[in-house]
Amino acid sequence: LVDYAHKPGAVQAVLATLRAQAAARAEAGRVAIVIGAGGDRDTAKRPLMGEAAARGAEFVVVTDDNPRTEDPAAIRAEVLAGARAVGRADRPAGAEEVREVGGRAEAIATALHWARPGDTVLIAGKGHETGQEINGVKHPFDDRDVVAQVLDGLVTDDADGDA
């Protein structure tokens, strides 16, 4: 699921909905999230984004969003701090360690490869956007295209018997 959720409340709401849907299935699935925060924007929300992700997903991958003119690693560190501050008791049962994968395409692939049938992967923050702004340059990038490419590769791997 690709969603524009780019504020802590939105992340929390989407994850709550996904968790409820997963729990309603005959075989409850797990939830993963790929999340980052934009540069040159509200810095106070970064740890809150990480916290919301960690409270609502078994698997959290912190990555780059639109770093703009800021250091992407510094932005990720702030999101990670919020995610890692959430204690095990406040995370979903079976939650894994929070991961950091700077490259957004690689982060998406990491989450999709983690997922099993019945799981849900939320790619949060960019939604409909078709570019990633880095150092004042907007590079072509669409989460939806990356998801399609990764899933196509997974289907091809399964058909070949390699997965």
Model-assigned labels for residue ranges:
Residues L1-A163:
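ATP-dependent carboxylate-amine ligase
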